[in-house]
Amino acid sequence: MNYVPLYIKTHNSLLSSLINEDDLINYAKKNNFTSLTITDNNMYGVLDFYYLCKKNDIKPIIGLELQIEDKKIVLYCKDYIGYQNLIYLSTKMSENSINLDLIKEKCANLICIVPFESNEMYSKLENIYTDIFQGYSSSEERKKLEGNNLIYINEVLYFDKNDFNYLKYLESIKTGNVVNSFEFDKKRNYMPDFDYIQNEFREDLKNNKYIYDNCNLELKLNQQLLPVYECPNSLDSYTYLKKICVEGLRKVFGDKVNVIYKDRLKYELEVINKMGFCNYFLVVWDYVKYAKENNILVGPGRGSAAGSLVSYLLNITTVDPIKYNLLFERFLNPERVTMPDIDIDFEYTRREEVVSYCIQKYGLKKVAPIITFGTFGAKQAIRDVGRAMNISLKSIDYLCGLIDSRLTLKENYNNNKRIQEYLNINQNFKHLFKIASKLEGLKRHTSIHAAGIVMSCVDLDQVIPLDRGHNDFYTTGYSMEYLEQLGLLKMDFLALRNLTLIKEVLKELPGFDFDNIPNNDFKAINIFASANTSGIFQFESDGMRRFLKDLKLNSPIIGISAIFIKQQLNIG
């Protein structure tokens, strides 16, 4: 059988590997791998890896490097139950709360390999895991082990042995040390010679095959995981939503409600109920209501959600969609099943209060901000490697000043003679540029999405890994592009500086109600016509101001933003 490495770390083990998912897949295809593993010290890259493998007809084997009692072990999931256990353990690892009792509790459907350097853990784990193997990475190590459960396992951090030097710079950036000031023993952490492995350790390859054959993860997609609002008096979500909307209709229009509004409300509620989104609307209604009751300024509504009469009657939006001929189908269409998307603007300084409210109401593990990843951009790579090389800040600043951030370092070099001339001044500068080019694009750090929040009816660590971090909240361990596929709904809580500015202005104007500003105030219209719109949301860009001048506006401004966006899309 063909050997496939079982201990591969990618750049998702931040600042510890030179391997990205795309290159790993290409390497696997070039070497005719039918299966492939990922074993980072977190699960950040699992979904990228899983979907890339599936797309390229490669069987994905999902693993996790776990640290217990200062020793590393590697776990692989056999199926979805094992995957859920990996998720849970990954979350606990972010809490620094891994122990043997927890390992014993979450051992089902997992395969364990204990690397040679952690061999003292083997006796503590052999009665926990049904499938457990003793790992080695050389003939010398193998001679010191006994049993028929031996397996070759070499931690892979880069493809070619000549790439070791690049990894050393990555380690330098991680630790903050100058590159030649520390020992770094990772010279053997490259892809092994497969022919050598197959000849030297042939008798143990049956154990590799066992892992390849028994790890068969199929992710569960499109689960029903929307958050659930607890309705009073044991009402179901549809009945309660309808009750609030009918009350809203009477509040806005009194007893004489136009039949157009009645019919539209009936239609929207039927669609919302049929698509299973009643709870979603109640959850949004609840946190918007909380914000308004606590004097947190909320925007009037944006995007396609403004086309929903239900949103209007729930006071989620403040624009009457029938009055302005806005289409509900742009928001929710029974012919096109997609998740609803209501973006809510909160004043910049108080957004976190609304997030905290949701966490307290629904549960710490049912609400989580969404993780994002920062990568080495061209200038960032130059600065980080320059510091590792102890090159003067003046020289680094000058070189960064020559770099166009829209281009890669290679493109910058090929298109800029001044960069070429500067690098020729000093061999260290050439070396800096070469190292930085190798690191460019690798993941560097994690951050939090500016607006995105995930909410669920189940603890999120049953579905995705979580990271314990910011303000003791959890963040998702997966980025937002995959969450909807798993059945999780992203909600946007946008922090808008303009709302904070309006709040401050309102303090100077007691009794003023900006919701009742007339649409035909021609003094205000003239301000827009003259493009004197600095600081006005969506009207302050250079392009919009030029558009306003060309338009020679003399009527209410409704629709201008939409026309401008459409024009920009057509130009693009």
Locate predicted features.
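Alpha-helical scaffold/interaction cores of sigma-54-like transcription cofactors
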Residues: 1-572
